[in-house]
Amino acid sequence: MVTLDSILSAPSLSNLFLRFCQEIIFVCWPRNLDFGILASSFCLKMAEEESQEFKLKVNSELRFEVEHKASAEIEMIEGSGEMFGTELAKNKKYAFVSGSKVAIYTWHGCVLKLKGKTEVAYVSTETPMTVYVNTHAALEQMRSKAEEDSTRGPRILVVGPTDVGKSTLCRLLTNYAVRLGRSPVLADIDVGQGNMGLPGTIGALVVERTADIEEGFLNTAPLVFHYGHKSPNDNFQLYNMLVLRLAEIINVRCEQSKKVNSSGVIINTAGWIRGAGYEALKQAAGAFEVDVICVLDQERLYNQLKGDLPDFVKIVLLPKSGGVVERSQAIRADSRDSRIREYFYGLKNNLFPHTFDVKFNDVKIFKIGAPSLPESCLPLGMKSQDSQTKLVPLVPAMSLLHHVLSVSAATTVDHDIVETNVLGFLVVTNVDMDKSVFTVLSPSPRPLPQTILLVMDIQFMDIK
């Protein structure tokens, strides 16, 4: 019998990628707003610079980082190559914006032309791609077995500290699965990045097309839940509740489709792996009922999980790519701002958000989580942890200025608003207490699809 260990130690299995998926992305929930493409922050005009040509040998990759407030362009002239599992088209130019970190890998060799301002650009033959593709091959065998037996496919939790390439590995494994005709669920519970919505959210998407080279997965209608903070530690109780809720809905979706069920689930996690963060990882593993955990570049975490989780959960230690770059707190903050900006304005400033006033009386605004009180001050039978998931009504005030608001799909306050998905996001750009209105930046024109709004701790200054 072929095992995960034997696959991981086998030679490269790149010849597995023979079929391609060209189906329409499944819409997880009906969306009432056209929120556009979640792309990169903004597009800058290509600098007039001489292009560089790189000739890549077999099993090597070109790595480059785009300078701040600059842009770069890549074109494949000869051969074949891929970016995080998505194949590049020959003689097509791909644009990358400020701060982009790109790796183009080739199994058989290629020639690439790079134009623009980059902080660094070099070719490396030291990559973990063989290990990654063999991991995919092992997962694919599990999917094939699940398809034959009409059972559930593999559920993979990708864990590790910050800046080890967890999101990239999830994207790569998802793309490889899609290229073999699978339809995996990609879930993101890293609230610091918010790949499915905005920072401060978690979400999931059924993927049936490979990620776009420039824009990533086209999140036309992901399932997204409001969390409201940048770290799971800010409201541990709420975070675990939402992760469990997301897992429950994914289970329902898998029950509705044999293809999705056998394709499995790939889950990206936050880089918080100590203390309560480690407990959150274990709870996520239980909520999603994972059978494989990929630990990136953290032997301590690998051994902890081996000791604490059941034997049926296969835990593998994978190396990180040498191209992974550590980010400072300032860079992380810039990345969050860019993520919000791209939501409203698009990759190439090709989206045009709307600005309009909202009357105080037309909406109901809430914050999830009340200040903690001593047990002695709480009502009989209530625990202090319960306050973390309590819905607190807010009176509109100047303190709303620049805060991100989630538009809840709940139609009335009688709904379980905390565990209801959101339809989209707004930013408060002005508050007029005299007129009892506040101004919002919105992806679509008025009226709002629903009137229940949830406040985030996350703020955004709309300065272009």
Label each residue range with its predicted role:
Residues 22, 30-31:
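Compositionally biased, intrinsically disordered low-complexity segments enriched in Pro/Arg/Gln/His
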Residues 42-151, 158, 172, 231, ...:
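Preference for solvent-exposed, low-hydrophobicity sequence contexts
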Residues 124-150, 164, 183, 204-205, ...:
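ASCE P-loop NTPase motor cores of helicases and related translocases
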Residues 153-157, 183-185, 264-266:
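Residue-level preference for the first positions of well-ordered beta-strands
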Residues 155-175:
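Glycine-rich phosphate-binding P-loop
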Residues 175-185:
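Post-Walker A helix-loop "phosphate-sensing" segment adjacent to the P-loop in P-loop NTPases
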Residues 185-264:
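Nucleotide-state-sensitive switch-loop elements of NTP-binding domains
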Residues 252-313:
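Phosphate/Mg2+-binding loops and adjacent switch elements
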